[in-house]
Amino acid sequence: MALDAAVKQSIIKEYATGEGDTGSPEVQVAVLTQRIKDLTEHMKEHKHDYHTQRGLLAMVGRRKRMLSYLKKTDIARYRALIERLGLRR
């Protein structure tokens, strides 16, 4: 399930650190978080969709690694991002 282009652009605009920023950890984690939320809703209806479940777990792992990187490099940005996204950490 891909994100709608308008939704993705609004997330990028909200979390970007500068003009044209799409690759910063904050933006990547925010986009992944939205995709994870969407797939979680999909999985509630389709419990036996194992292909989606595997992709969802891969996204969660990727987000976890990005958050770990951000925590190691800049703890203040990490804490601010966790607070903004409402993640339980």
Curated annotation (Swiss-Prot):
Keyword Ribonucleoprotein attached: yes
Keywords for the protein's UniProt record, in alphabetical order: Ribonucleoprotein, Ribosomal protein, RNA-binding, rRNA-binding
An example Gene Ontology biological process: translation
Domain of life: Bacteria
PROSITE patterns (alphabetical): RIBOSOMAL_S15 (PS00362)
InterPro entries: Ribosomal_uS15, Ribosomal_uS15_bac-type, uS15_NS1_RNA-bd_sf
GO terms under cellular component: cytosolic small ribosomal subunit
Subunit description: Part of the 30S ribosomal subunit. Forms a bridge to the 50S subunit in the 70S ribosome, contacting the 23S rRNA.
Similarity remark: Belongs to the universal ribosomal protein uS15 family.
Protein name in UniProt: Small ribosomal subunit protein uS15
Species, as recorded: Pseudarthrobacter chlorophenolicus (strain ATCC 700700 / DSM 12829 / CIP 107037 / JCM 12360 / KCTC 9906 / NCIMB 13794 / A6) (Arthrobacter chlorophenolicus)
